[in-house]
Each structure stands twice: as C-alpha cells, then as structure tokens.
Amino acid sequence: MSVIAYLLILGAYLLGSISSAVIFCRLAGLPDPREHGSHNPGATNVLRIGGKLSALGVLMADILKGMLPVSLGFYLELPISVIGFIALAACLGHIFPVFFKFQGGKGVATAFGAIIPMGYSVAGLAVGTWLFVFLISGYSSLSAVITALIVPLYIWWFSSELTFPVALVCCLLVYRHHDNIQRLWRGQEDRGWKKKHSRQNGY
C-alpha cells in the first residue's frame, strides 16, 4: 500500500476514536454517557439520559466518522481493498478509541456511515433490514445484529472486493452486542418502543 493509504487508515482510526457522545454531552451540560444510562457512549444512550438534540448530533457525527474517510478514499481512487480497511479502521476507532482507554460505543452508526459511500443500494438495504426486523420484533439490538449478519451478503452482491473488511466490521458489531444477545436469549431485553428503556441496552 502507498503512504497515503496508510495515512488514511490511521486518520480514519483517530477520527473514529473521537467520542461524539462525550463531546455533545459536555457541550449540552448532560451527564457523562459513560457513567449514566447504559454506560455506552452512543446516540441511544444520549437520548436515554435526556438530550434529544444532542442524540441527533451524536448520531450524525458518528455517521460522518465512517463516511468521511471512506469517501476520501474513493475520491483519491484508492484500491477497493484499501477503502475497505479504511472503513474497518474508522469502526475500530469508535469501538476501541485510543483517546478513551479503548472503551467506546457499539459502532452501528459509524459502520453505516462507512457503508454509504460504498453504495446507496447497500445502505438502503441495510436501513430496510433494520427497520423490518425492528417493526416485527421491537428490539433495536436484534435489528442491529441481524442487519450486521446480512450486510456482508449485500456487499458481496454489489461489490465483492469489499466483502472481507465489511464482514470484519460486522463481526465487531455482533461482538459488541454480546450482552444484548444474552439478554435476548434470556428474554430480558427491553423492546425499543417501550417508554421504559433498559439501562443495559444502547449504542
């Protein structure tokens, strides 16, 4: 790989390591999301602790953390395989942020942002899959896990060169939901449309 490729991969990881949830909560005077709610620095937990606008800001910022470096990779016409690893680096940064003791979020929004430049068809199918599962089950965590399991098939169909790195990203997402999966198995996971949310669920 070229020096530019290595720099972009490093830059994607560092950008992903910036915790949007912590920053927006500080700006809005909200509690630290790492110490309240689900203790997860993500948009869902920010919404849970009372910041609707902050939650929206976190969601958009986390999406951009994945979308911007991947878009730059396409703009620079880097090899598809390199772009895939740029996406992986951004998600690794969000999940294991170097600036926050490697304790980050679950990576759903950042992974979605990374997928958008790869193809609107794949991104649309991912959103559709998430919504379909959520409307049937009511579980946002189950929706995220099933979508993560299916997205590699979408990528393989539309851009097979990206299948391996995207599959790695999706494996990370499933791993980060292991607590949710255990609660789903035990029947202890709260449904997304309930007013009372579980303190253990969230992105």
From Swiss-Prot:
**Membrane topology type:** Multi-pass membrane protein
Q: Sorted alphabetically, which InterPro entries does this protein's record hold? A: G3P_acylTferase_PlsY
Carries keyword Acyltransferase?
A: no
Keywords in alphabetical order? Cell inner membrane, Cell membrane, Lipid biosynthesis, Lipid metabolism, Membrane, Phospholipid biosynthesis, Phospholipid metabolism, Transferase, Transmembrane, Transmembrane helix
Q: Where in the cell is it found?
A: Cell inner membrane
Q: In which pathway does it act?
A: Lipid metabolism; phospholipid metabolism
Reactions listed under catalytic activity: an acyl phosphate + sn-glycerol 3-phosphate = a 1-acyl-sn-glycero-3-phosphate + phosphate
What are the recorded GO MF terms, alphabetically?
acyl-phosphate glycerol-3-phosphate acyltransferase activity
Where are its TM segments located?
A: 4-24, 56-76, 80-100, 115-135, 149-169
One GO term describing the cellular component: plasma membrane
Gene Ontology BP term (one) = phospholipid biosynthetic process
**EC category:** transferase
Instruction: Report the EC number(s), separated by commas if there are several.
Output: 2.3.1.275
UniProt keyword annotation of Chloroplast present: no
Q: A Pfam family this protein belongs to?
A: G3P_acyltransf
The record's principal subcellular location, in a coarse class, is membrane
Task: Name the family the entry cites.
Answer: Belongs to the PlsY family.
NCBIfam families to which the protein is assigned, alphabetical = glycerol-3-phosphate 1-O-acyltransferase PlsY
Chain's role:
Catalyzes the transfer of an acyl group from acyl-phosphate (acyl-PO(4)) to glycerol-3-phosphate (G3P) to form lysophosphatidic acid (LPA). This enzyme utilizes acyl-phosphate as fatty acyl donor, but not acyl-CoA or acyl-ACP.
Assembly description: Probably interacts with PlsX.
| Protein name, per record | Glycerol-3-phosphate acyltransferase
Tell me what organism the protein belongs to.
Glaesserella parasuis serovar 5 (strain SH0165)
